[in-house]
Amino acid sequence: MTHITESEMKQKYLDLLSQKFDSAEKLATEIINLESILELPKGTEHFVSDLHGEYESFQHVLRNGSGNVRAKINDIFKDKLSQQEINDLAALVYYPEEKLKLVKNNFDSIGTLNIWYITTIQRLIDLITYCSSKYTRSKLRKALPEQYVYIIEELLYKSNEFHNKKPYYETLVNQIIELEQSDDLIIGLSYTVQRLVVDHLHVVGDIYDRGPKPDKIMDTLINYHSVDIQWGNHDVLWIGAYAGSKVCLANLLRICARYDNLDIIEDAYGINLRPLLTLAEKYYDAENPAFKPKKRPDKDVSLTKREESQITKIHQAIAMIQFKLEMPIIKRRPSFEMEERLVLEKIDYDNNEITIYNKTYPLKDTCFQTVNPNNPAELLAEEKEVMDKLLLSFQQSEKLRRHMSFLMRKGKLYLPYNGNLLIHGCIPVDENGEMESFEIEGERLSGRELLDVFEYHVRRAFDHKESTEDISTDLVWYLWTGKYSSLFGKRAMTTFERYFIEDKASHKEEKNPYYYLREDVDMIRKMLKDFGLNPDEGRIINGHTPVKEIDGEDPIKANGKMLVIDGGFSKAYQSTTGIAGYTLLYNSFGMQLVAHKEFNRKEKVLSMGADELSVKRVVDEELQRKKIRDTNIGKQLQDQIDILKILMHDRYLT
């Protein structure tokens, strides 16, 4: 290969660039355009976390921009429209197709319906004009429905100073109605408003878990205009399963069985569970109370006796496979320090008790039919065959491939963005606030360095799906369950104890000290510095742990340097948190934390226009309004400008 000097590489790059900008005028226009964009206000960032498969709640928060849509409507219409009209307009923007059907049923003549169309189109045009005021025309054009760009731009930028065009604009709207395009136009305008009120979405982890529709959330995110993801522990579990980890696969199947969500596997991703059911029915009892599926809060119809029986058996079968599969990993990776989790070896099968963490407990609801006491890690031939088939099906699911590839493309373990650190779980520390170190391939790592190496191994495992027992695949499982994992954030996962030990003290999972030290300002400053961020201006934005507002816990910690935005979309947590989750908005004026009430049904929003939103709390207000210049995108644009100016001086200025 020919050696190219840095100077030669620079010249080749400038040569390529000059083909696109082949005149001084074109180059100057681009520089002027980019320099001008830097002076615009920064766009609104929207932070959500811990979606846990709750598609309907997530959809609503996305459609209303955590209250941003209603705020914009209030800004321009509060003195012009009644509260009911504002509610109706908000509901139309959130759910345009459904709201249109309801509205049209209320009219008894075409004439009054047409007047409504004219009024509504104008209101939506006014709303878009207001919402797009900090965007370039080019950016707005990309947000408009493609088939109506010309018509909408004419209505947006109409100038009627001399009244010459009044008939033109009237005809434009009348023809839209006459040609029966008004419904589609209103739907397109409504989705444009949704898109304009949020410039960029951050999903701070856990799209997957116990909720019923993570696949629909993934489809929504794939089609979203601008998004990034910080992986959560449940997301990494799914990535691990797709990447070839059978123990990750067993874990997620167990969770789906426990929460009556196996239809995610079968219906959403098309994976055949019949071989697992056949195995389960051969060996396991339908009456084991510890393994009966939890009642799903979104299901109106209860499981039939037969369905409950099948799930209970599957639940036991996959749990035992999971405990067996964990053992070889723990033994071949002593650096994981997980010997206490060799639970099947610690059982006295004659006396039905276990000695764990130096304490002996009697066991209840046991189902050790397939365990060989002399070799507890040994899988039956049938168990091995079932797991081989399931892994193959998992890796061959086209929909799952698409979703996992998107998670890898848009996801990271952590993200420094616009001066803030976004991370789902924690940065492992000891009781003194020192970064905890963990050995990977002979090297001790901590802090940012540790997280970078974890992420490297997640990507390596994903790229080598055929390797199922390598260090990278094992580390993906460790991220799910290990004590130095930034995603798990606890000392041990007590799954076995919860199933088989009555004593609730054994169920306790001790959290990493990070979770109480994050109240300390100096601790947060130290972490921000370790991740290359300004400790005076930056914040950590965290998910993973539900904020128990009902007990007086505050999501704003360390004098506003730490923001915790999980409170849970997951219905299972809402009785302990007292709310249905936090989201965060960060616009050019500052940050607002939004606490949400439980989202019941969109029908209520459609009929009454009532939002399931509660309080917005101002986290801070910027002393000086932030511009695009102050953001990550601004830095990228400035780099482009610098290169273009070099080209200008190199080729066109003498």
From Swiss-Prot:
Which keywords accompany this UniProt record?
Carbohydrate metabolism, Hydrolase, Manganese
- The record's gene field reads fbp
Which GO molecular function annotations are given, in alphabetical order? fructose 1,6-bisphosphate 1-phosphatase activity
Q: What is its EC number?
A: 3.1.3.11
Top enzyme category = hydrolase
* UniProt organism field: Staphylococcus epidermidis (strain ATCC 35984 / DSM 28319 / BCRC 17069 / CCUG 31568 / BM 3577 / RP62A)
Family assignment from sequence similarity: Belongs to the FBPase class 3 family.
The cofactor(s) it depends on are: Mn(2+)
UniProt-recorded name of the protein: Fructose-1,6-bisphosphatase class 3
